Amino acid sequence: MRPLPDQSAFEDKSELVSKKQKNEDENNENRSPETPRTPKVCPKTPTKTPLRTPTKNQAGVQFLTQKKRTKSCSSHFEYINQIGEGSFAKVYKARSFVDGRLYAVKKSKKPIWETSERNQHIQEIENGMKLGHHNNIAQVMCAWEEGGHIFIQMELCERGNLKDALNLAVQEEGGLGKLPEYMIWQYLCDIANGLSHVHEKGIMHLDIKPENLLFSNDGVLKIGDFGVCSTTTGGDDSEGDQIYMAPELLNDIHTPSADIFSLGITLYEMATNYNLPQKGQWWRNLREGKIPFPENDDSISQDLKDLIILMMNPDHTKRITIQSLLKYDKLQSVITLKRSTSTLYRLQRKLF
């Protein structure tokens, strides 16, 4: 087994403490913002330029520019409340008047006329189309444009995201202050399966982090938000949240291995529940293979520590691949258990 990393990497513990310790100080900071009033129907003003993207792909996902529609697509939805917000868009929970089902509808914060910004939204739509349906991917259903705003109708994952789960673990009375390890392995199984599908389609996500890992109604973890991702042949210079960013992206080296690092540091956060650094010496240490774990903490197995070290290897050419990750002994046993449990559940549904 590989030795544990140099514990002196984080000699000053003042900046690297558990979220449970800092929870009271950060209470106001972590509180969800008040939900603003949502628009009833988006304006129907004509767009300046129709988006140039396929109107339909093999998965059946459609994109409609205003010139191709006879009425506002937004009028097909009842907007219930805002459930998320990013740099470029807000996400609403909405009920379709067509089928009565609930969806997530993402709306750009402002009309998108600037080319690079439009291209980023188009990229998210096209990659969603390319990925199609997968159990561990938040599916894109449809997209359209109104008044310069871009809308994306997606599968609703209303049980929150992994960041929410980590915060709840901190607040749990008498708990570990973090997720139990058996749960971490189950979540890793979901994420790894989804990421394998993403890479098989020739796409790099480039923004794997807890906020972009969403829980479906049945508790399955799904990868969402493909607004930053790039194709493996595209030579794009996109990069996501620097807290989870792979070190080689600083040198404009874009490979699927960057997603493995981001997943590895996400796994590290899940296992330790440390507040990860955004910059400075601690940030650099984590990207130089100096990965400290809490001392005298037997809640983190050696299997999990070893895997995190493999995933966060500073050399992207030596980092474990998604194929090898799925074959990792411990993860294989979890995958087998999940499959057998799922099969048993389906049989019970048929019989009873």
Swiss-Prot record:
Q: Name one Pfam family in it.
A: Pkinase
Query: Which residues does Mg(2+) bind?
Result: N212, D225
Q: Where is the Protein kinase domain?
A: 77-331
- Per its UniProt entry, which superkingdom is the organism in? Eukaryota
Q: Which GO terms describe its molecular function?
A: ATP binding; metal ion binding; protein kinase activity; protein serine kinase activity; protein serine/threonine kinase activity; protein tyrosine kinase activity
Biased composition range(s): Basic and acidic residues: 10-34
- What residues form the catalytic site here? D207 (proton acceptor)
Protein name as annotated: Probable protein kinase DDB_G0291842
The protein's organism comes out as Dictyostelium discoideum
